[in-house]
Amino acid sequence: MTNSSEFTDVLQSRDPCVSNGIVINIDPIDPEPTPIRKEFTCEDTFHHEHHGNSEGFKTLTAFLCLMLSAFLNFFLLTVIHDVVPRQPLPDLTFMIIPQQRWAWSVGDVLSTVSSVVAFTIIFLHHQRWIVLRRTFLLGAIMYGLRAVILGVTFLPPSFHNRDEICQPQVNRTAMYGMEIATRFLTYVITLGLTSGQDKILCGDLMFSGHTVVLTIMYFVQLQYTPRGLVILRYIAAPITFLGIAALVVSGGHYTMDVLIAYWLTSHVFWSYHQIFEMRKDDRPQAPLSRLWWFWLCYWFESDVADGKLVNKWNWPLEGPQRMHTIMNRINYKLQ
């Protein structure tokens, strides 16, 4: 028990840290105050603030890695456009279904819809920084690998009417550097979305970047959606696969481009989650730790608790209070 003056001092204290680690628990049934061990100390508060800063820094670093990979893809496209041959390769899908250029816009729209849904889920997830960082990292890995493939093997455009769709190739003249810079800035501003352009750069085929985005966004929805929203997963599946099909039907990609992109992305995504949901002590000895990207990502996951993240939602902003109440009710119904 504690005396009255000590009890009053604790109640009036504004300091969130108690030096002796004791806080007073007031039981509504038993009016006698009972001292219990405080759940965190001054050191814990400092660690929590440091941990929050570290999480933000890691997320920013992951985003910069993604931007570096994406910009490298854009730059390579501006160069290889003038190198790739013009005669398209035979493709079974093109033999069965005539190419439909309107389908490319459908692929862009479905990619955007899937991304908006996935980032909304990330925004509402109570571990949003971890999920966002993982999404950035997975995108950086896939686009980094894609940059390597683009830089070593050049496939001809898959369009049958390539002269109407692809920009003309340019000889390396004195103005070639300015042409490359203009192309690069255009793709940076539009984030690679080309459905609104009359003519586009051609040659970035193996493997499909749109399919990478569609697949990662789809898997994010599968992995981080609360159990009560299982219907969302059934909506995400047709959006994803219709978007992938539209890319091929439009003639914008060979069938092998999207198949390889989906296969690689699925392996990287689920391998990443399998290994980083293990106990920290077991990760370096796991067979998947031999993957080339494991140690690149190890630092990003060093402060994440063992096991799978609990898929709960909360409102990330301080206000309005009504949104916090709504999120609590939604959480209760979705679990």
Swiss-Prot record:
**Disulphide-bridged cysteine pairs:** none
Kindly report the protein's main subcellular placement as a broad class.
Answer: membrane
What membrane topology is given? Multi-pass membrane protein
Per the record, the pathway is: Lipid metabolism; sphingolipid metabolism
Question: What spans does the record annotate as topological domain Cytoplasmic, numbered to this chain?
Answer: 279-335
Q: Name one GO biological process term.
A: sphingomyelin biosynthetic process
Q: Which reaction does it catalyse?
A: an N-acylsphing-4-enine + a 1,2-diacyl-sn-glycero-3-phosphocholine = a sphingomyelin + a 1,2-diacyl-sn-glycerol; an N-acyl-15-methylhexadecasphing-4-enine + a 1,2-diacyl-sn-glycero-3-phosphocholine = an N-acyl-15-methylhexadecasphing-4-enine-1-phosphocholine + a 1,2-diacyl-sn-glycerol
Active-site residues from the entry: H210, H253, D257
Bilayer-crossing regions: 60-80, 104-124, 136-156, 200-220, 229-249, 258-278
InterPro entries for the chain: Sphingomyelin_synth-like (IPR045221), Sphingomyelin_synth-like_dom (IPR025749)
User: What subcellular compartments does it reside in?
Assistant: Membrane
Q: Which GO terms describe its molecular function?
A: ceramide cholinephosphotransferase activity; sphingomyelin synthase activity
Which Pfam family would be a valid example here? Answer: PAP2_C
What GO CC terms are in its UniProt record? endoplasmic reticulum membrane; Golgi membrane; membrane; plasma membrane
Q: What is its EC number?
A: 2.7.8.27
What's the domain of life for this entry? Eukaryota
Family, similarity comment: Belongs to the sphingomyelin synthase family.
Q: What does this protein do?
A: Sphingomyelin synthases (SM synthase or SMS) synthesize the sphingolipid sphingomyelin (SM) through transfer of the phosphatidyl head group of 1,2-diacyl-sn-glycero-3-phosphocholine (phosphatidylcholine, PC) on to the primary hydroxyl of ceramide (N-acylsphingoid base), yielding 1,2-diacyl-sn-glycerol (diacylglycerol, DAG) as a side product. Functions as a bidirectional lipid cholinephosphotransferases capable of converting PC and ceramide to SM and DAG and vice versa depending on the respective levels of ceramide and DAG as phosphocholine acceptors, respectively.
- The protein in question is named Phosphatidylcholine:ceramide cholinephosphotransferase 2
Give me the gene this protein comes from.
Answer: sms-2
